[in-house]
Amino acid sequence: MAWPKRARTVNWESGVLILDGEKRFEVPELTPEIMEQLAGYTLVGFHVKGYPVTDELLATFAGHKSMVNFGVEDGALTDACFPVFSAMPKLRYLMLDGNAAIHGSGLSALQG
């Protein structure tokens, strides 16, 4: 797969990765290498639905400077994910619906 030089938004659902709403790639799983590639872009939006994204996979996004909108729906995140989001200075929208292992004990990491 030939990755584009830049991307601003990422959406993954049902094995299809869409960059900037138009560039489509068949990506059946989000490997650590793919997540690193995506975290290397100057993204403002990232959304994954129906993939077991873990806290470890998410770690590559820690400190992402331009991220405004981030969502992982029906993933495998836990309360340990919140420090990754607290290190995103421009983050304004966070959607974590369907991550059954999130109970709220990590929310204090977002206060600041």
Q: What residues fall within each predicted segment?
A:
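Concave beta-strand-loop units of leucine-rich repeat
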Residues: 4-112
